[in-house]
Amino acid sequence: MKTVKDVSEITGISIRTLRYYDEIGLLKPTKLTEAGYRLYDNKAVEKLQEIMFFRELEIPLIDIKKIMDNPNYDKEQALLTQKSLLEQKRNRLNGIIELITDVMKAC
């Protein structure tokens, strides 16, 4: 079992964020000690790595929770949906970059 400090050091996720994930039910510690310390097993750390992956894809925490709480969730479908959203965002950003370039040429 790993303490919240250990998990924080391993993953780079702050202790505050780990506590927040616990508060919102996204990542519950495997065990609480009598003193109230959070302990995590390897399975919980693996789940945290999945959460980190989804966050890297800019998936909101509420959606990550829905995905992970659904026993029948389709990881591939979730990734396809996020890919589509990121492509739309990229297209918007490309449009903004083109606009800025045009404005700069006019200066």
Predicted regions and their residues:
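Basic helix-turn-helix/winged-helix DNA-binding cores
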Residues: 1-66
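Short, charged amphipathic alpha-helical surface segments
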Residues: 52, 65-107
